[in-house]
From Swiss-Prot:
Localization, UniProt: Cytoplasm
Protein name as it appears in the record: Small ribosomal subunit protein eS4x
Gene assigned in the entry: RPS4D
HAMAP family: Ribosomal_eS4
Lineage: Eukaryota, Viridiplantae, Streptophyta, Embryophyta, Tracheophyta
Keywords, sorted A to Z: Cytoplasm, Ribonucleoprotein, Ribosomal protein, RNA-binding, rRNA-binding
SMART domains: KOW
Protein backbone atom coordinates (compact mmCIF):
# COMPACT_ATOMS: atom_id res chain seq x y z
CA UNK A 1 0.00 0.00 0.00
CA UNK A 2 1.32 3.45 -0.94
CA UNK A 3 2.09 5.67 2.01
CA UNK A 4 2.35 9.41 1.39
CA UNK A 5 4.14 11.33 -1.32
CA UNK A 6 6.48 9.96 -3.93
CA UNK A 7 10.02 10.86 -2.94
CA UNK A 8 11.62 10.18 -6.33
CA UNK A 9 11.36 11.48 -9.88
CA UNK A 10 12.71 9.60 -12.89
CA UNK A 11 14.75 11.66 -15.33
CA UNK A 12 12.56 10.68 -18.29
CA UNK A 13 9.47 11.88 -16.42
CA UNK A 14 10.99 15.28 -15.51
CA UNK A 15 9.52 18.36 -17.28
CA UNK A 16 11.09 19.00 -20.70
CA UNK A 17 11.86 22.63 -19.88
CA UNK A 18 14.37 21.51 -17.21
CA UNK A 19 16.52 20.45 -20.19
CA UNK A 20 18.10 17.43 -18.49
CA UNK A 21 20.06 15.01 -20.67
CA UNK A 22 18.83 11.42 -20.78
CA UNK A 23 22.26 9.93 -20.07
CA UNK A 24 22.91 11.98 -16.90
CA UNK A 25 21.59 9.26 -14.58
CA UNK A 26 18.30 7.55 -13.80
CA UNK A 27 16.80 10.15 -11.47
CA UNK A 28 16.07 13.89 -11.38
CA UNK A 29 15.62 16.12 -8.30
CA UNK A 30 12.02 15.92 -7.08
CA UNK A 31 10.78 19.44 -6.20
CA UNK A 32 9.72 20.03 -2.59
CA UNK A 33 6.23 21.24 -1.74
CA UNK A 34 6.15 24.98 -2.19
CA UNK A 35 4.63 28.01 -3.89
CA UNK A 36 4.79 26.62 -7.44
CA UNK A 37 3.47 23.44 -9.07
CA UNK A 38 6.04 20.68 -9.54
CA UNK A 39 5.66 20.77 -13.35
CA UNK A 40 5.92 24.59 -13.46
CA UNK A 41 8.99 25.17 -11.29
CA UNK A 42 12.78 24.87 -11.38
CA UNK A 43 14.41 23.33 -8.26
CA UNK A 44 17.30 25.34 -6.77
CA UNK A 45 19.76 22.51 -7.43
CA UNK A 46 19.17 22.86 -11.20
CA UNK A 47 19.55 26.66 -11.04
CA UNK A 48 22.91 26.49 -9.23
CA UNK A 49 24.40 23.40 -10.90
CA UNK A 50 22.93 23.24 -14.41
CA UNK A 51 22.16 26.88 -15.24
CA UNK A 52 24.61 29.08 -13.30
CA UNK A 53 27.36 26.39 -13.19
CA UNK A 54 28.39 27.42 -9.65
CA UNK A 55 28.59 23.75 -8.62
CA UNK A 56 29.63 20.55 -10.36
CA UNK A 57 27.82 18.07 -8.13
CA UNK A 58 24.72 17.75 -5.95
CA UNK A 59 26.92 17.80 -2.82
CA UNK A 60 28.53 21.10 -3.80
CA UNK A 61 25.04 22.60 -4.20
CA UNK A 62 24.14 21.47 -0.66
CA UNK A 63 27.28 23.11 0.80
CA UNK A 64 26.55 26.39 -1.06
CA UNK A 65 22.97 26.44 0.24
CA UNK A 66 23.99 25.54 3.80
CA UNK A 67 26.30 28.57 3.84
CA UNK A 68 23.11 30.61 3.24
CA UNK A 69 24.34 32.22 0.01
CA UNK A 70 21.12 31.87 -2.02
CA UNK A 71 17.99 33.98 -1.59
CA UNK A 72 14.64 33.56 -3.34
CA UNK A 73 12.32 36.60 -3.17
CA UNK A 74 14.54 38.14 -0.47
CA UNK A 75 14.48 35.07 1.84
CA UNK A 76 17.40 32.70 2.40
CA UNK A 77 16.55 29.22 1.14
CA UNK A 78 18.54 26.14 2.21
CA UNK A 79 16.30 23.46 0.68
CA UNK A 80 18.14 22.01 -2.33
CA UNK A 81 14.90 21.14 -4.14
CA UNK A 82 13.00 24.35 -3.27
CA UNK A 83 10.66 25.08 -6.22
CA UNK A 84 11.49 28.48 -7.72
CA UNK A 85 9.02 29.52 -10.42
CA UNK A 86 7.88 32.20 -12.84
CA UNK A 87 8.64 35.80 -11.71
CA UNK A 88 10.70 34.64 -8.68
CA UNK A 89 13.82 36.70 -7.91
CA UNK A 90 16.94 34.60 -7.18
CA UNK A 91 19.66 36.66 -5.48
CA UNK A 92 23.29 35.83 -4.65
CA UNK A 93 24.59 38.66 -2.38
CA UNK A 94 28.15 37.23 -2.39
CA UNK A 95 28.51 37.88 -6.14
CA UNK A 96 26.05 40.84 -6.29
CA UNK A 97 23.88 39.00 -8.82
CA UNK A 98 20.11 39.00 -9.21
CA UNK A 99 18.06 36.90 -11.62
CA UNK A 100 14.37 36.78 -12.45
CA UNK A 101 12.88 33.50 -13.66
CA UNK A 102 11.03 34.11 -16.93
CA UNK A 103 10.11 31.97 -19.94
CA UNK A 104 11.75 32.15 -23.34
CA UNK A 105 9.60 31.78 -26.49
CA UNK A 106 10.27 28.02 -26.55
CA UNK A 107 8.58 27.67 -23.15
CA UNK A 108 11.80 27.06 -21.20
CA UNK A 109 12.87 28.83 -18.02
CA UNK A 110 15.34 31.65 -18.56
CA UNK A 111 17.42 33.16 -15.74
CA UNK A 112 17.21 36.81 -16.74
CA UNK A 113 19.85 39.01 -15.07
CA UNK A 114 18.36 42.13 -13.42
CA UNK A 115 19.60 45.17 -11.49
CA UNK A 116 19.36 45.60 -7.69
CA UNK A 117 16.52 48.12 -8.09
CA UNK A 118 14.37 45.64 -10.02
CA UNK A 119 15.15 42.81 -7.59
CA UNK A 120 13.22 44.62 -4.83
CA UNK A 121 9.82 43.78 -6.31
CA UNK A 122 7.94 41.08 -8.20
CA UNK A 123 4.65 40.88 -10.07
CA UNK A 124 2.07 38.44 -8.69
CA UNK A 125 -1.12 37.39 -10.45
CA UNK A 126 -4.21 37.39 -8.22
CA UNK A 127 -5.87 33.97 -8.04
CA UNK A 128 -8.87 34.85 -5.85
CA UNK A 129 -10.26 37.38 -3.37
CA UNK A 130 -12.06 36.12 -0.27
CA UNK A 131 -13.26 37.20 3.15
CA UNK A 132 -11.89 35.68 6.35
CA UNK A 133 -13.06 35.85 9.96
CA UNK A 134 -14.84 39.07 10.95
CA UNK A 135 -15.17 39.98 7.26
CA UNK A 136 -11.46 40.71 6.73
CA UNK A 137 -10.77 40.70 2.96
CA UNK A 138 -7.67 38.96 1.65
CA UNK A 139 -6.28 37.93 -1.72
CA UNK A 140 -4.43 34.81 -2.84
CA UNK A 141 -1.71 35.01 -5.48
CA UNK A 142 -0.41 32.42 -7.92
CA UNK A 143 2.78 31.94 -5.88
CA UNK A 144 0.91 30.96 -2.72
CA UNK A 145 0.88 34.32 -0.91
CA UNK A 146 -2.00 35.61 1.18
CA UNK A 147 -2.26 39.40 1.58
CA UNK A 148 -4.85 40.97 3.87
CA UNK A 149 -6.71 44.26 3.31
CA UNK A 150 -6.02 44.67 -0.44
CA UNK A 151 -7.32 47.60 -2.49
CA UNK A 152 -11.05 46.97 -3.13
CA UNK A 153 -10.51 47.66 -6.86
CA UNK A 154 -8.23 44.60 -7.24
CA UNK A 155 -10.05 41.66 -8.85
CA UNK A 156 -9.03 38.06 -9.77
CA UNK A 157 -6.63 37.85 -12.78
CA UNK A 158 -5.25 41.35 -12.04
CA UNK A 159 -1.53 41.65 -11.28
CA UNK A 160 -0.08 43.26 -8.15
CA UNK A 161 3.37 44.80 -7.79
CA UNK A 162 4.69 43.44 -4.49
CA UNK A 163 7.49 45.03 -2.45
CA UNK A 164 9.52 41.99 -1.33
CA UNK A 165 11.06 43.68 1.73
CA UNK A 166 7.83 45.04 3.22
CA UNK A 167 5.58 42.34 1.68
CA UNK A 168 3.11 45.07 0.70
CA UNK A 169 1.23 45.90 -2.49
CA UNK A 170 2.79 48.98 -4.13
CA UNK A 171 0.62 49.15 -7.25
CA UNK A 172 -1.62 46.95 -9.37
CA UNK A 173 -2.46 46.37 -13.04
CA UNK A 174 -6.01 45.63 -14.19
CA UNK A 175 -6.55 42.70 -16.54
CA UNK A 176 -7.84 44.88 -19.40
CA UNK A 177 -7.75 45.08 -23.19
CA UNK A 178 -4.68 47.09 -24.29
CA UNK A 179 -2.34 45.93 -21.50
CA UNK A 180 0.85 43.98 -22.18
CA UNK A 181 0.87 40.33 -21.07
CA UNK A 182 3.12 37.26 -21.06
CA UNK A 183 1.75 33.78 -21.78
CA UNK A 184 2.70 31.30 -19.03
CA UNK A 185 1.15 28.09 -20.35
CA UNK A 186 0.25 26.21 -23.51
CA UNK A 187 2.06 26.17 -26.84
CA UNK A 188 2.54 29.98 -26.84
CA UNK A 189 4.31 30.03 -23.46
CA UNK A 190 6.89 32.81 -23.23
CA UNK A 191 5.31 35.04 -25.88
CA UNK A 192 4.63 38.70 -25.04
CA UNK A 193 1.90 40.84 -26.56
CA UNK A 194 -1.01 43.19 -26.00
CA UNK A 195 -4.55 41.97 -25.28
CA UNK A 196 -6.79 42.68 -28.27
CA UNK A 197 -10.08 41.19 -27.06
CA UNK A 198 -11.67 38.70 -24.66
CA UNK A 199 -14.06 36.00 -25.84
CA UNK A 200 -16.40 34.84 -23.10
CA UNK A 201 -17.90 31.37 -23.50
CA UNK A 202 -20.61 30.45 -21.04
CA UNK A 203 -19.75 27.31 -19.11
CA UNK A 204 -16.36 27.01 -20.84
CA UNK A 205 -12.94 28.64 -20.99
CA UNK A 206 -12.51 32.32 -21.73
CA UNK A 207 -10.32 32.93 -24.79
CA UNK A 208 -7.89 35.85 -24.92
CA UNK A 209 -6.66 37.20 -28.28
CA UNK A 210 -3.16 38.71 -28.13
CA UNK A 211 -1.08 40.64 -30.68
CA UNK A 212 2.72 40.81 -30.40
CA UNK A 213 4.87 43.80 -31.42
CA UNK A 214 5.45 42.38 -34.93
CA UNK A 215 1.69 42.25 -35.60
CA UNK A 216 1.21 38.48 -35.29
CA UNK A 217 -1.99 37.47 -33.51
CA UNK A 218 -2.57 34.35 -31.42
CA UNK A 219 -5.11 33.14 -28.87
CA UNK A 220 -4.88 31.32 -25.54
CA UNK A 221 -6.91 30.54 -22.44
CA UNK A 222 -7.48 33.10 -19.70
CA UNK A 223 -5.58 30.98 -17.14
CA UNK A 224 -2.41 31.12 -19.27
CA UNK A 225 -2.23 34.93 -19.42
CA UNK A 226 -0.16 37.02 -16.95
CA UNK A 227 -0.37 40.83 -17.10
CA UNK A 228 3.11 42.38 -16.85
CA UNK A 229 2.48 46.08 -17.55
CA UNK A 230 0.13 48.94 -18.33
CA UNK A 231 -0.31 49.81 -22.00
CA UNK A 232 2.55 48.48 -24.11
CA UNK A 233 5.26 49.12 -21.49
CA UNK A 234 6.15 46.11 -19.26
CA UNK A 235 7.04 46.79 -15.59
CA UNK A 236 9.81 44.17 -15.64
CA UNK A 237 12.74 43.93 -18.05
CA UNK A 238 12.37 41.13 -20.60
CA UNK A 239 15.04 38.68 -21.83
CA UNK A 240 16.67 38.88 -25.26
CA UNK A 241 14.07 38.65 -28.02
CA UNK A 242 11.42 40.51 -25.96
CA UNK A 243 9.00 37.57 -26.13
CA UNK A 244 8.66 37.61 -29.94
CA UNK A 245 8.45 34.10 -31.41
CA UNK A 246 10.28 33.70 -34.72
CA UNK A 247 9.13 31.33 -37.44
CA UNK A 248 11.39 28.39 -38.40
CA UNK A 249 12.57 30.27 -41.53
CA UNK A 250 13.35 33.44 -39.54
CA UNK A 251 15.31 31.38 -36.99
CA UNK A 252 17.32 29.69 -39.76
CA UNK A 253 18.14 33.07 -41.36
CA UNK A 254 19.22 34.48 -37.99
CA UNK A 255 21.47 31.46 -37.37
CA UNK A 256 23.07 31.79 -40.82
CA UNK A 257 23.67 35.52 -40.32
CA UNK A 258 25.39 34.91 -36.96
CA UNK A 259 27.57 32.15 -38.48
CA UNK A 260 28.63 34.41 -41.35
CA UNK A 261 29.39 37.26 -38.93
CA UNK A 262 31.59 34.91 -36.87
Amino acid sequence: MARGLKKHLKRLNAPKHWMLDKLGGAFAPKPSSGPHKSRECLPLVLIIRNRLKYALTYREVISILMQRHIQVDGKVRTDKTYPAGFMDVVSIPKTNENFRLLYDTKGRFRLHSIKDEEAKFKLCKVRSIQFGQKGIPYLNTYDGRTIRYPDPLIKPNDTIKLDLEANKIVEFIKFDVGNVVMVTGGRNRGRVGVIKNREKHKGSFETIHIQDSTGHEFATRLGNVYTIGKGTKPWVSLPKGKGIKLTIIEEARKRLASQQAA
